[in-house]
């Protein structure tokens, strides 16, 4: 009878979450790249979901130099720290993040138009 009660307490998925801590920071979350229309033909590109392990100000500096655009880090009440760049930089950001190894292709979610 005690053997049967032991079966009830066995959880086959108890160890399923082990090993997740071996993944690099931010791999379980998506990086969202959005575009927002401003006045006229002007647009803003926002990048949200980059792990806190990375210095966002240094990333903005690299984006500004590589893409020849202006950018800043803003504090969004819902999304936390968000990188904001002038112009439509969605493809450039995707290529750059994959190139430097910050994200994989399946982690990037591109929104807009």
UniProtKB/Swiss-Prot annotation:
Keyword check for Lipid biosynthesis: no
Modified residues (N-acetylserine): 2
Keyword Nucleotide-binding: no
Described function: Component of the 43S pre-initiation complex (43S PIC), which binds to the mRNA cap-proximal region, scans mRNA 5'-untranslated region, and locates the initiation codon. Together with eIF1A (EIF1AX), EIF1 facilitates scanning and is essential for start codon recognition on the basis of AUG nucleotide context and location relative to the 5'-cap.
Secretion signal span: none
Pfam families hit by this protein: SUI1
Biological process (GO), any one: positive regulation of mRNA cis splicing, via spliceosome
Gene3D superfamilies per the UniProt record, alphabetical: SUI1-like domain (3.30.780.10)
Sites marked Binds 40S ribosomal subunit: 41, 65
Record-stated family: Belongs to the SUI1 family.
Domain of life per record: Eukaryota
GO molecular function: translation initiation factor activity
Subcellular location: Cytoplasm
Protein name: Eukaryotic translation initiation factor 1
Principal location: cytoplasm
GO cellular component, one term: cytoplasm
Modified residues (Phosphoserine): 2, 9
Keywords from the named record: Acetylation, Cytoplasm, Initiation factor, Phosphoprotein, Protein biosynthesis
Quaternary structure and interacting proteins, as annotated: Component of the 43S pre-initiation complex (43S PIC), which is composed of the 40S ribosomal subunit, EIF1, eIF1A (EIF1AX), eIF3 complex, EIF5 and eIF2-GTP-initiator tRNA complex (eIF2 ternary complex). Interacts with EIF4G1; in specific 5'-UTR length and AUG context. Interacts with EIF5; which in a mutual exclusive interaction associates either with EIF1 or with EIF2S2 on a common binding site. Interacts with RENT2.
Taxonomic lineage from the root: Eukaryota, Metazoa, Chordata, Craniata, Vertebrata
InterPro entries: SUI1, SUI1_dom_sf, SUI1_euk
PANTHER family: EUKARYOTIC TRANSLATION INITIATION FACTOR SUI1
Encoding gene (name): Eif1
